[in-house]
Amino acid sequence: QLFPWSRYLTGTCGTAPSDSFDPLAYWVEQAHARNLRLEAWVNPYRICAGANAQSDFDALPDSSPAKQHPDWVVSCDGGYYFNPGIAEVRQLICDGVSEIVSKYAVDGIQFDDYFYPSTQFDDAATYQASGSNLPLADWRRDNVNQLVQAVNTAVHQNAMQAGCRFGISPSGIWRNRGANAFTGSATHGFEHYSSSYADSVTWIKNGWIDYICPQIYWQIGDTAADFQTLANWWSHQVRGTDVQLVLGLAAYKIGDSQYGDVWANDGCGEIGRQLDLAAGIQDIDGCALFSYQNLRGNDTLFQTVQERWK
């Protein structure tokens, strides 16, 4: 009721599939018939992005919240995003999540790693109007924190499926250890705390999520972001909490030379070593592969995983 039908279903945004076919209801039914969980993946703020962002935005029907409330929308880096600093935007996202979990027997909601798309996000007017005494970066993180806390409440209050969970899959580095972040990981890479304004450690410590799935998409021994270093660091963040830790693994890198010799020549072996390493670290509850299309059709990878998960 809140958002138009996706163009990926029929080719036209806002057009429903024929014969009242509901793909999500079908997927849930078929997954549960096979003893599989199905969680709905949500990218909370992004409206349109990529090379066709402008034409995709123009093609949105008038019923789209982005068209009904243009003052909620910010153009950034060639894409269009809902402004996280607007309370009505946070409510819209919560309502959208509530609609999913109350009408479908999904087993969870998972947010992807996209929050603020850039440090250059044009929200100066919203920041000024808020009257906040927080510095801009902290204000942005607080906006995301408010959304995470509210969505957690919405999931657990409105879910029709028993045991429905709320999890987030952020990029693999919270903060790099340094002069201003003594508690960060011993890494050198993109950090979501300062670049996306996503304070995942605060979510964990406050119990606002049921699980966290950091995308540790580097190899064991990587000089900038070693897989083992990050696996151990994240395990310490969830220790003593009720938040489960699932490590995201980069199956998409297998066989691709742009990611280096290890991934190009022994990618399946690398995934196997990462699975073995994770299994031996306290407080790691499992691993997730990104993505299924990389598992399907790769018999070696399938066997690598099956041997460990049978």
Model regions and ranges:
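Active-site-adjacent "subsite" loops/lids of carbohydrate-active enzymes
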Residues: 24, 28-29, 39-103, 194-198
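Substrate-binding cleft of secreted/luminal carbohydrate-active enzymes
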Residues: 197-223, 234-310
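Aromatic- and acidic-residue-enriched segments that line the glycan-binding/catalytic groove
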Residues: 5-17, 46-77, 114-132, 177-190, ...
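Solvent-exposed loop/turn segments at secondary-structure junctions
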Residues: 2-6, 44-48, 115-117, 172-176, ...
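Conserved, mostly hydrophobic/aromatic
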Residues: 31, 93, 100, 109-112, ...
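Aromatic-lined carbohydrate-recognition surfaces of secreted/lumenal glycan-active proteins
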Residues: 37-49, 110-114, 138-193, 242-254
